[in-house]
Amino acid sequence: MSTLNKLQRPARSWHRKKRVGRGQGSGLGKTAGRGGKGQKARTGNMRFEGFEGGQSPLQRRLPKFGFTPPNRTVYAVVNLSDLEQHFDAGATADVETLRKVGLVKGRYHGVKLLARGELTKKVTVVVHKASEAAKAAIQKAGGAVEEIPLVAHKPESAAKAHAGKGVKAPRQPKA
């Protein structure tokens, strides 16, 4: 068994740093591997990706399209196969337990249940949204689905301002 203090890189698994422009004998003298003269041989060769030699580039010829709505609702997706794998019969799968078992990771506005896979166990599911097929499959297995409303998110500062807390009073002029 190998130990950490005996680990070694495989032979020839790294390259020596190229020292360019240091004489003809090195093989990388004179033009330093940049070929002859021209824009690419100069320093500051900053043509952007997509440059077409002065012709109007493709990304400027085509129109802009679409956008990402800043206030969209993003759901974490949980499938029936996930419930089958992580929960025993008679269990309750709510948002908190879904996070604990690792089915919901990261920040989402809510959890949505979809019908991919099969469910044979009686499970009670408490989520924000569920597809009709998922509801039917859970009820067929003897379980139940409860949909809870999404909590409207207010930033802390907006909530404080709305409650009248943390709002500074106007400064009084000096007498």
Curated annotation (Swiss-Prot):
It holds the Pfam family Ribosomal_L27A. PROSITE patterns: RIBOSOMAL_L15. The keyword Cytoplasm does not apply. The keyword Ribonucleoprotein applies. Residues 12-21 have a biased composition (Basic residues). Belongs to the universal ribosomal protein uL15 family. One of its GO terms (cellular component) is cytosolic large ribosomal subunit. Binds to the 23S rRNA. This is Large ribosomal subunit protein uL15. Keywords: Ribonucleoprotein, Ribosomal protein, RNA-binding, rRNA-binding. PANTHER family: 50S RIBOSOMAL PROTEIN L15, LARGE RIBOSOMAL SUBUNIT PROTEIN UL15M. It comes from Myxococcus xanthus (strain DK1622). It comes from the Bacteria. One of its GO terms (biological process) is translation. GO terms for molecular function: rRNA binding; structural constituent of ribosome. Residues 22-38 have a biased composition (Gly residues). InterPro entries: Ribosomal_uL15, Ribosomal_uL15/eL18, Ribosomal_uL15/eL18_sf, Ribosomal_uL15_bac-type, Ribosomal_uL15_CS.
